[in-house]
Amino acid sequence: MERQFEIVSAYSPQGDQPVAIEKLVEGINSGKKKQVLLGATGTGKTFTISNVIKEVQKPTLVMAHNKTLAGQLYSELKDFFPNNAVEYFVSYYDYYQPEAYVPQTDTFIEKDAQINDEIDKLRHSATSALFERDDVIIVASVSCIYGLGSPEEYRELVVSLRVGMEKDRNQLLRELVDVQYGRNDIDFKRGTFRVRGDVVEIFPASLDEHCIRIEFFGDEIDRIREVNALTGEVLAERDHVAIFPASHFVTREEKMKVAIENIEKELEERLKELNDNGKLLEAQRIEQRTRYDLEMMREMGFCSGIENYSRHLTLRPAGATPYTLLDYFPKDFLIVMDESHVSVPQVRAMYNGDQARKQVLVDHGFRLPSALDNRPLTFDEFEEKTNQVIYVSATPGPYELEQSPEVIEQIIRPTGLLDPPIDIRPIEGQIDDLLGEIQDRIAKNERVLITTLTKKMSEDLTDYLKDVGIKVNYLHSEVKTLERIEIIRDLRLGKFDVLVGINLLREGLDIPEVSLVAILDADKEGFLRSERSLIQTIGRAARNENGRVIMYADRITRSMGIAIEETKRRRSIQEAYNEEHGITPKTIQKGVRDVIRATTAAEEPETYEATPAKKMTKKEREKTIAKMEAEMKEAAKALDFERAAELRDLLLELKAEG
């Protein structure tokens, strides 16, 4: 029986949500490939998207630009769809140091990773759900465009078991080993099985506490039961069960033999090429590493870093598009790109960064050239694989607007809250003026966000406010994701009243208690003060009925002008709607709860060693400057302004010393 998406919620669509839902559904049903939902902060974009999914009844991939945001969306969607399969698919690394080689110092960095077992389980749960049912929503980070094993292989290697089926017990054990399950009669955990006489217990890779107990009578399956793995309590009787592979990179034996032959052939060609070019060390290195991997694959059907051979294992030609999570979806599916102004540039950037690192490994004999095909999708490949897309953002980027010129707006908040009024005040005396405003807010038990241009200014301002007795905290780039969540929680609970930072646009900063957002040096045109950044920052004051924004500036820049006009336009639409429907704006009442503890991938941004510029050659300095400028622009594009500002300050120092 086909399951339908159904929303369980005490709310019904309000404000301009019904119109947005109707237009989006109409667009999808009429076959529109791309649509843009411009949803102002706090207008209930997730609820709108949930209603669209319910209306169109299509499996949906919701893409977020980081794990924390994906975690928040997963929690919200799980609340709206308790009877459907809402799954979570993000990188399963708690810590990830990719394999790399630094030729200048002849340093090889082994891949070092710590896999989060819980997230690995959720990833398996996500892929198996796509093969078992249609009512699936998968919330994913951009790791969903990285290579996965072939969905056909994954589907074909499912071990299907039914009551009454003729099956030799030992044959079942062999099949389980073929799909990467290990026999373990003592430490019974996910991805293992154990045998007790005529009873085989299997712990599927996608389950947490339940295992499947298969009871044989001779060569026939007599009974299938779902059992609590810890207590042995029988939870359910089953007529049929499908055991999905314990790894996404699984290959049938005959395919594995062909793959091993092809890898050996490639190795011989590569050795000849390296020896002909006099690269003897590289030749010895690649031969030693590859032969070891081949031996492991012959004996175990698996090796460490097997994903680097994925092109051979799936028998794809060189340069072919890799399989990703998108291939596990049926043809007719929907993609929702949340915060698309960040997600789209992020998808674009993935491929180039990955190739640059791998090319060095190939050149120096650490990997065969085919490893370059274990990669994320290019942007064009991603576009080809998408069916229908909804881009969701308060400030859609140029790409989204170009793809879908007709923007669907959602500006009215169900709470009646308005976009905040904006004051422009002179820079001279800004700190004293700001101090007075802060004290007014503290007296009313409200909170303040202050955004500055440089790290130094943030630190100085924080110190000054502390000295005059204000409870203040400073949010900077070194603060890890989970600490950020703690800081935001403490701000909401009133442990401090003011939060200072460079980049206040990251996730989780929509705080109802904030009634003032102060933007210092608002007239310094640049990536920190672009129209998109300003509109996003202004939105931080839109969850409180007393919300207000103060821009400290001596002139109105083009970006300021656009942001102010757009805010006024939205505010007038909201006021007219409130007047017509007799709505009085009310601050959002939102309980303070712990956000889902999503883990962070420890692929830290590059750090630049403090080599004095005087000791650098002219060429080295130019190279470092070019590299830092490129990284600064990338960081700015991704709205990671703290990192971009840090790099800008380093660049200024470097240029000055040069």
From Swiss-Prot:
Domain Helicase ATP-binding per the UniProt entry, residue ranges: 26-413
Gene3D superfamilies named in the record: 6.10.140.240, P-loop containing nucleotide triphosphate hydrolases, UVR domain
Signal peptide: none
GO CC terms: cytoplasm; excinuclease repair complex
Keywords: ATP-binding, Cytoplasm, DNA damage, DNA excision, DNA repair, Excision nuclease, Nucleotide-binding, SOS response
Pfam families recorded: Helicase_C, ResIII, UVR, UvrB, UvrB_inter
Compartment annotation: Cytoplasm
Annotated residues for binding of ATP: G39, A40, T41, G42, T43, G44, K45, T46
Keyword Transferase: no
Domain of life: Bacteria
Domain Helicase C-terminal: 430-596
Entry domain remark: The beta-hairpin motif is involved in DNA binding.
HAMAP family, per the entry: UvrB
Function noted in UniProt: The UvrABC repair system catalyzes the recognition and processing of DNA lesions. A damage recognition complex composed of 2 UvrA and 2 UvrB subunits scans DNA for abnormalities. Upon binding of the UvrA(2)B(2) complex to a putative damaged site, the DNA wraps around one UvrB monomer. DNA wrap is dependent on ATP binding by UvrB and probably causes local melting of the DNA helix, facilitating insertion of UvrB beta-hairpin between the DNA strands. Then UvrB probes one DNA strand for the presence of a lesion.
Family (UniProt): Belongs to the UvrB family.
Complex formation: Forms a heterotetramer with UvrA during the search for lesions. Interacts with UvrC in an incision complex.
NCBIfam families linked: PRK05298.1, uvrb
Stated name of the protein: UvrABC system protein B
Organism: Bacillus anthracis
Gene, per the UniProt record: uvrB
